Amino acid sequence: MSLFITFEGGEGCGKSTQSKALYRYLKKLGLGCVLTHEPGGTRSGDKITRLLKWSEEENISPLAELFLFNASRSILIDNVIKPALLDGNIVICDRYTDSTLAYQGYGRGLELDTVKCINSLASGGLVPDLTIWLDMDDKAALLRKGKLPPDRFESENNGFHQRVRDGFGVIAAAEPNRFLKLDASLSQSELTKCIKQRVNALLKLPQ
């Protein structure tokens, strides 16, 4: 049974940790599963990621960010996500189109309809079956990053991160059946348990 699951949220909320935990769980059950991430997930996409997150030589406008994220996305979908789904796998993706809408739309202030249009073109209209939103206060989440050097997005001010968080809230409220909102301040084990329960229900597995 093919299934497309995405993880969303602000910086440091634990998306990578929980997406990996879900991947390990599904593989242990013997299910075909592919774990990937945005931006990046392919060699070409990883080059775009480095430009988006670490470029200090040139100014990258919000519109340029929008196109770069979606260029990376289109490559990932064509080379990883769609083939895996067609083969009947469960695909888990750390970030997807909702992040672009939250960051470049609500965070950067681009017209929301423009962001949605470009997202739709790049994704071919592919919508996740389940989106897990790990919600957390942005200040507390960024503290989790520790002493690692911040990238362009982590370096943004608190106002930006709050707009992104609010944006995720609006997006989730518009599609309540697709979203599972979880308090990311819960323990890792508690979050993993909640996620497993929802995924088991989708796959019609015993709880």
Swiss-Prot record:
This is Thymidylate kinase. It is an enzyme of class 2 (transferase). It comes from Dehalococcoides mccartyi (strain ATCC BAA-2266 / KCTC 15142 / 195). SUPFAM superfamilies: P-loop containing nucleoside triphosphate hydrolases. Coiled coil: none annotated. Phosphorylation of dTMP to form dTDP in both de novo and salvage pathways of dTTP synthesis. Belongs to the thymidylate kinase family. HAMAP family: Thymidylate_kinase. Gene3D superfamilies: P-loop containing nucleotide triphosphate hydrolases. Its EC number is 2.7.4.9. One of its GO terms (molecular function) is ATP binding. The lineage of its organism: Bacteria, Bacillati, Chloroflexota, Dehalococcoidia, Dehalococcoidales. It catalyses: dTMP + ATP = dTDP + ADP.
